[in-house]
């Protein structure tokens, strides 16, 4: 999408790019950055996703795909914000016990951002030696709160509804 780190905006140009992607893939759920975070791109990106998701459901906003075909309106049913740097209260916690190691492996794919004892780069808050331990500890704590090994907390833009108490753990 070619959004510039630190300098993208929640404006028509960037919203239309997000709308094109939403209409192409037609997701029911979108997971995006926290609405409040240390890094300025995270809350900006979060709000951009929320607004573009709403706009993607409006028929009067016209977009075309990469082959110049007119796209149909589509609005995701749910937007969930994962929790990043700040200790935000989740609206719900998902049991990720069976997937925690996979998540940590995925996080480590961005190795240049995290602790490397051989790095000559200046230290950042997420490149400290203990940052990945913090990520693990948060998953352990969220898991503790719902009685499982590991949990992932999310913030929802709307109230969550359930049709059965059997869905709750």
In which residue ranges do the predicted regions lie?
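A conserved beta-strand->alpha-helix junction
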Residues: 1-6
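Metal-dependent de-N-acetylase/amidase catalytic core
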Residues: 9-169
